[in-house]
Regions:
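Nudix hydrolase/Nudix homology domain
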Residues: 103-149
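Hydrophobic pocket-lining residues within nucleotide cofactor-binding pockets
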Residues: 49, 80, 94-96, 106, ...
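A short, polar/proline- and glycine-enriched secondary-structure boundary/capping micro-motif
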Residues: 37-41, 101, 112-113
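Conserved N-terminal beta-strand and adjoining loop/helix that marks the start
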Residues: 1-27, 45
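Conserved Nudix-box catalytic region and its N-terminal flanking loop in Nudix hydrolases
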Residues: 24-65
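Active-site segment of metal-dependent pyrophosphate-handling enzymes
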Residues: 64-98
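Short beta-strand micro-motifs in enzyme catalytic cores
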Residues: 13, 86-90, 110
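Short, charged/polar surface micro-motifs in flexible loops or helix N-caps
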Residues: 20-25, 32-34, 50, 83-84, ...
Length: 149
């Protein structure tokens, strides 16, 4: 179960971005591979903050690595503590068409309305089936995403 926990002293720091597109959010269906976190789950685009890297640098790097895209602007919207993770959350708008993106990590890009995300099960067009959203991504959406549309 997803729980907020402010008691931990050391965290794994992660940057995550909510990419907004015409009233919807872009999400990534994670690969179905052993050894990765939350395989086969939908999540927002994110990455671990590396040594000597700021949360902003991390999200720029991750967006470039995962989508071959450089957003014109993004903004920091807050942080969320989820167990041992400290999530630095950003928001940006996709101004171009989704077809201009190239997914380099993950199985699929999905575009979902907030009401669909609320259901916690999102449809994959590639797999023709529903898959769960990661608990952390759902927590980030609950805290921040509902208020951005």
């Amino acid at each position: 179960m997803f729980m907020l926990d402010d008691s931990a002293n050391s965290f794994i720091e992660v940057s995550q971005v909510l990419i907004h597109f015409r009233g919807t959010y872009l999400m990534q269906l994670r690969d179905f591979k052993d050894g990765i976190e939350s395989p086969g789950h939908w999540g927002f685009f994110a990455g671990h903050i590396e040594a000597e890297e700021t949360p902003e640098q991390t999200i720029w790097r991750e967006i470039q690595e995962e989508l071959c895209w450089q957003p014109e602007n993004f903004r920091y919207i807050g942080e969320l503590i989820a167990g041992s993770r400290k999530m630095h959350v950003f928001h940006c708008e996709l101004e171009n068409e989704i077809e201009t993106l190239s997914l380099m990590e993950g199985e699929e890009i999905g575009v979902f309305l907030p009401q669909e995300i609320e259901e916690k099960q999102l449809y994959s067009k590639i797999r023709n089936s529903f898959f769960p959203i990661t608990e952390i991504s759902y927590g980030v959406f609950n805290k921040f995403g509902k208020y951005l549309t």
